[in-house]
Amino acid sequence: MTSLPSSIFQGGLGDQPQSGLVPKVVEQTTRGERAYDIFSRLLKERIVFIGTPINDQIANLTVAQLLYLESEGSSQPINIYINSPGGVIYSGLGVYDTMQYVEAPISTTCVGLAASMGSVLLAGGEDGQRACLPNSRVMMHQPMGGTEGQASDIEIQAKEMAWLKKRLYQILSFHTGKDIDQIEEDADRNHWLSAEEAQEYGLVDQVMNEGNLDALKSIHANGEASDADSDEE
């Protein structure tokens, strides 16, 4: 776990390497070639991908994408794919609140790992539209952080940590239907769940098997067909 400023609390599995390489996608249209970075191309399909630890920068980018899609006025779902070890709680709560704010339904899918704050975002999707891929892992635990300074400063930060812990448990309780005391007991230490266990716990609504993966591909294929029609107009 990396050291953080005394006023910052986080929950996660530590730093992960981040690559600056972003693939480009080139499309042929009736108006010629169009080149997109891969994330812009996904955004065009109303897909937001969170694939790193959640910090202020990632949270700001995610919030901006959600607000952009909301500004389009479409009632089509926004699909958030999560592969994240967690991160800074304040940053994650900003993303969570934006997910609840936008009017378009938010679907969430765990692809690989949704740990700590990542599990909160996963659970925060629209009821019936939260999923895990079959080999995904989900992990819940209590917030972590540290501080230093005078005794009064430490007391203030301890109270803030307690508030964050309570608020996160309230959010998980709301989305899972579990009692807060049960959430607190389970999250006292790293609590790992398989995709099926996450579904049973109420963090997600389904595990994507071959059948509903085909259905998902069909939805995206129909979306691409609509885009092609609009390009020809």
Curated annotation (Swiss-Prot):
EC number of the protein: 3.4.21.92
Catalytic center residues: 116 (nucleophile), 141
Molecular-function annotations in GO: ATP-dependent peptidase activity; ATPase binding; serine-type endopeptidase activity
Superkingdom in the source lineage: Bacteria
Chief subcellular location: cytoplasm
Subcellular location: Cytoplasm
Keyword set, alphabetical order: Cytoplasm, Hydrolase, Protease, Serine protease
Listed GO CC annotations: cytoplasm; endopeptidase Clp complex
Catalytic activity annotation: Hydrolysis of proteins to small peptides in the presence of ATP and magnesium. alpha-casein is the usual test substrate. In the absence of ATP, only oligopeptides shorter than five residues are hydrolyzed (such as succinyl-Leu-Tyr-|-NHMec, and Leu-Tyr-Leu-|-Tyr-Trp, in which cleavage of the -Tyr-|-Leu- and -Tyr-|-Trp bonds also occurs)
GO BP: any one term: protein quality control for misfolded or incompletely synthesized proteins
Function: Cleaves peptides in various proteins in a process that requires ATP hydrolysis. Has a chymotrypsin-like activity. Plays a major role in the degradation of misfolded proteins.
HAMAP family, per database record: ClpP (MF_00444)
Subunit structure: Fourteen ClpP subunits assemble into 2 heptameric rings which stack back to back to give a disk-like structure with a central cavity, resembling the structure of eukaryotic proteasomes.
Name recorded for this polypeptide: ATP-dependent Clp protease proteolytic subunit 1
Organism (species): Salinibacter ruber (strain DSM 13855 / M31)
